[in-house]
Regions:
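Pyridoxal 5′-phosphate
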Residues: 1-93
Length: 93
């Protein structure tokens, strides 16, 4: 029987090409990008390369691309950014 998944608000299936592209980072290049050791630095380089590719795809600067750990963190990041941008001290009349 074919299964149909309807809870896409919680998670979505990962496209096979994405899984294939990510496999090296699950097994070989898994270092903490904040660490100074070689595995960490390799991970940092990979993240910055990915950031550059995403920026290019969406017509942004690399420093404008922020990766978060998930939906809740992303939502909070956006809401805090909106609140900060609309602080009365930031208003120019």
């Amino acid at each position: 029987m074919r299964r149909i998944y309807l809870d896409h608000a919680a998670t979505t299936p990962t496209h096979p090409e994405v899984v294939e592209a990510m496999l090296p980072y699950f097994s070989d290049a898994f270092g903490n990008p904040s660490s100074l050791h070689s595995l960490g630095q390799e991970a940092k380089v990979a993240i910055e390369e990915a950031r550059g590719k995403v920026a290019h795809l969406i017509g942004a600067r690399s420093e404008e691309v922020v990766f978060t750990s998930g939906g809740t963190e992303a939502d909070n990041f956006v809401l805090k950014g909106i609140a900060y941008a609309n602080e009365p001290s930031k208003q120019q009349y």
